[in-house]
């Protein structure tokens, strides 16, 4: 069975219904460390304005007091990749695929199933906070590595920010899809292309119930097709040709 890893997104959009929120035990030290920061320190930790930090302080306080609403993570995150992922009108099989084979890597919650109920928050691995003297990446690394050890065939749709939490010995075993567009005879890629294509790729996987590496190579989605020439054992290239 294939296991997919995807990143979080800064943009969030709460979609009813909401649920009671329960913070995982491993996340509590992070919440406590953030709660100790002054508004100015919080702004520096997030690299945001004081006004934006005030909003985040209220969110953190609500989480700490058990007053936050929670939403399925794949519905709450609303970045470009998530907007290009099929999230509504899923069949039971597609819903099972999304909830049992796709996991979200979070700097606040750890590695969670896509349907895990989470609260609105602003947090990533660039957040400047230490937990017991450790950076967020080092704090989560043992748990991330254990996940990689327990899941043999990982398909990584992670950016370097999230990928680098894992030890390199595990990263080397993954398959990492790469997405490029042909323009004026040249192959181009940038973050917008990649984010949109990740969502479309994952949609194709769940719609076709893809379970093997060979099946990944047969996929076509949003104009992208697998390219044998460029691909290696661990990097699968998907190219969108000029129309």
Swiss-Prot record:
Recorded superkingdom: Bacteria
Membrane-crossing residue ranges in chain numbering: none
High-level lineage: Bacteria, Bacillati, Bacillota, Bacilli, Lactobacillales
Organism: Streptococcus equi subsp. zooepidemicus (strain MGCS10565)
Signal sequence residues: none
Protein family according to the UniProt entry: Belongs to the UPF0246 family.
Protein name: UPF0246 protein Sez_1855
One cellular-component annotation, GO: cytosol
One Pfam family per UniProt: H2O2_YaaD
A biological process from GO: response to hydroperoxide
